[in-house]
């Protein structure tokens, strides 16, 4: 394995999922993260797979059969080795095509509301990469071209022709991202609003608004920004600067929502993500819930669990079970204790 703190680990859980109980810094979150990498080849906690390698190791490997389908992902400095039912997959796209879907919930989700735009872009990107292979490819091309353009701008020399060539890629792939994000947000709006009412138990109105940083015409925005980008030595327009506006009862949620409302909005956003994945793909995502239940009151915990599809697989981490009796739906899930890098049933 050699994944973060684990040199090796084997765990067998029921199809319904597992509750992982243990103190902080014992590896509970890492288990959820490894499952996310196995399913989606990406971590919600890091953009780079290299950062997941256990200290002193050359790479990591994760394997499992979450849907009666043996999957293996092995990372090393020279690339990824991917297999499904022992058959090699030549690239990430072919590995992900018949794979599963993931919704990750954690306390860091509060940053979706009160944090910088990067957090909300990651929310949209994690959704988009699962919904649409074209989105995943466009985002990969966009990031590579953006990195190259920024390097040329930082160089400071006149290299206009090279910069323009990368801008053509940025316009083509960026337009795909913008159109997709606008469509995703439009589909999320009613789902998030419904989830907000269910979890809060109140008639609260949650509204999502897509804000493309470049306006509707990306090519024209880049043209208008050329002098500014030359002066600042970085690209200042494009989907990498987009944002997702969140309003509660007509007011900016990050400025006016209470702590309880912030937690409810974060849950509503992730529940909406899960429902949209289910509607589009026709299958239930795995819900990975990292230490969120201890921070919720019984009403919100039960509303959350009742809103999740009964057939979905749920993995939950927690440091204590004081809240468990008040949440019968969680009490029915198998429990495991995690301590010192070991998992005990």
Name these PLM-found stretches.
Residues 1-23, 37, 49, 161-172, ...:
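Conserved NTPase motor "head" modules and their coupling/switch loops across ABC/AAA+ ATPases, GTPases
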Residues 28:
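Conserved lysine of the Walker
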Residues 64, 313-320:
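Structural recognition of the conserved hydrophobic beta-strand(s) that form the central parallel beta-sheet
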Residues 111, 118, 122-164, 168:
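Long, charged N-terminal accessory/stalk domains
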Residues 287-288, 316:
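Hydrophobic positions in the central parallel beta-sheet of the AAA+
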Residues 290-292:
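Walker B catalytic acidic pair
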């Amino acid at each position: 394995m050699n994944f973060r703190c684990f040199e090796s680990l084997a765990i067998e859980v029921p199809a319904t999922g597992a509750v992982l109980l243990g103190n902080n810094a014992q590896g509970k979150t890492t288990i959820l993260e490894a499952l996310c990498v196995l399913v989606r080849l990406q971590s919600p906690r890091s953009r780079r797979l290299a950062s997941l390698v256990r200290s002193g190791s050359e790479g990591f490997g994760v394997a499992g059969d979450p849907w009666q389908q043996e999957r293996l992902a092995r990372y090393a400095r020279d690339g990824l080795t991917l297999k499904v039912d022992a058959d090699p997959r030549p690239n990430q796209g072919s590995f992900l095509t018949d794979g599963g879907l993931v919704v990750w919930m954690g306390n860091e989700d509060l940053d979706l509301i009160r944090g910088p735009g990067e957090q909300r872009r990651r929310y949209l990107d994690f959704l988009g990469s699962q919904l649409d292979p074209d989105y995943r490819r466009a985002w990969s091309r966009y990031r590579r071209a953006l990195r190259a353009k920024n390097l040329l701008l930082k160089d400071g020399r006149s290299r206009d022709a090279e910069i323009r060539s990368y801008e053509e890629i940025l316009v083509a792939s960026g337009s795909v991202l913008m159109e997709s994000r606008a469509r995703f947000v439009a589909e999320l709006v009613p789902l998030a609003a419904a989830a907000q009412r269910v979890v809060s138990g109140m008639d609260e109105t949650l509204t999502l608004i897509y804000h493309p940083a470049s306006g509707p015409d990306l090519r024209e925005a880049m043209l208008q920004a050329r002098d500014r980008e030359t002066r600042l030595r970085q690209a200042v327009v494009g989907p990498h600067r987009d944002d997702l506006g969140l309003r509660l009862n007509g007011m900016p949620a990050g400025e006016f929502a209470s702590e309880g409302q912030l937690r409810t909005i974060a849950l509503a956003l992730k529940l909406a993500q899960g429902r949209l994945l289910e509607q589009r793909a026709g299958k239930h995502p795995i819900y990975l819930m990292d230490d969120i239940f201890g921070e919720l009151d019984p009403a919100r915990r039960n509303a959350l669990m009742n809103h999740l599809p009964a057939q979905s697989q749920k993995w939950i981490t927690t440091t204590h079970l004081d809240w468990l009796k008040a949440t019968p739906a969680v009490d029915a899930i198998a429990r495991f204790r995690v301590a010192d890098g070991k998992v005990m049933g």
